[in-house]
Amino acid sequence: MSEERELLRETVAALVEKHASPEAVRAAMESELGYDPNLWRLLCEQVGAAALVIPEEFGGAGGELADAAVVLEELGKALVPTPLLGTTLAEIALLSVGRTEPLEELAEGAKIGTVVFNPEFVINGDIADIMIAADGETLTQWDTFTAQPKPTMDMTRRLASVIPGATTTLGDDQGLADTAALLMAAEQIGAASRCLDLTVAYSKDRVQFGRPIGSFQALKHRMADLYVKVASARAVVHDSIATPSSTSAALARYFASEALSAVTSEAVQIHGGIAITWEHDIQLYFKRAHGSAQLLGPPREQLRRLEAEVF
């Protein structure tokens, strides 16, 4: 990771630590907007989070996809609900067809964007100002639309069912779903990493039979296996983002989804019954794991895509 990108990561991590405590995350996810507008403003003003993938001539930071991935990975660690994923994808879609008019307001965070892959489950669909539909062949802007929030298992990710009204065809879809898969994989890796950290910390504090449960060899082995799984998945995701393609996107999503699901499942087992209580954060990571795995195609679908490359 470059020095500039590491500085970006540290800046986001500091903001998250200060403004996105578990209590703040819960308050944000239960709010009318589904995110904390003050934190969103700080991310846009101090980090330029919504401007990272936009060229400087259009009011952006002139960064790369990997920069946005770094921010999403840090936000994923604390399950911070923000409009960043959808807004970034909308910006990439608009840039791919040369439609630059909305970019300045998106970069400032004044407007929220999102992308429709499945109209029944649109990220931040009920709060978006700019909505782009991608069907694998064509990008279409939904100039008017009706959105209905959907009840979700993962309350940290706002989803809505959206029906289009007036639409405008923008141009060819150059693989926006693959870009979305890469960014979501980065977010998943962040969540997996933090969930594992929380589990290790708990195993050191929880005493049973007169000693911390983390000192028992069976649990040591399980957590060591999880560490390898997360580290391996992170390497795959980072390499995939550096060399994006349809194949690398499927790889990233498969490994990230499997890693997060494995970590959260073991976290529930190691924590015991407390993990599934509303007051404990592990249940939020468990729900994020299974909710995210179903968006943009579940792991088995990614595996089928990879198999098609071989057979």
Curated annotation (Swiss-Prot):
Coiled-coil region list: none
Q: What does this protein do?
A: Involved in cholesterol degradation. Catalyzes the dehydrogenation of 5OH-HIP-CoA to 5OH-HIPE-CoA.
Q: Which EC number(s) does UniProt give? A: 1.3.99.-
Give the record's GO biological process terms: cholesterol catabolic process
Protein name, entry field? Acyl-CoA dehydrogenase IpdE2
Q: Which domain of life is it from?
A: Bacteria
Q: What happens when the gene is disrupted?
A: Deletion mutant grows normally on glycerol but shows impaired growth on cholesterol. It accumulates 5OH-HIP in the culture supernatant.
InterPro entries with a match to the protein in the record? AcylCo_DH-like_C, AcylCo_DH/oxidase_C, AcylCoA_DH/ox_N, AcylCoA_DH/ox_N_sf, AcylCoA_DH/oxidase_NM_dom_sf
Names of required cofactors: FAD
Q: Which family does it belong to?
A: Belongs to the acyl-CoA dehydrogenase family.
Reactions listed under catalytic activity: 3-[(3aS,4S,5R,7aS)-5-hydroxy-7a-methyl-1-oxo-octahydro-1H-inden-4-yl]propanoyl-CoA + A = (2E)-3-[(3aS,4S,5R,7aS)-5-hydroxy-7a-methyl-1-oxo-octahydro-1H-inden-4-yl]prop-2-enoyl-CoA + AH2
Q: How does it assemble?
A: Heterotetramer composed of 2 IpdE1 subunits and 2 IpdE2 subunits.
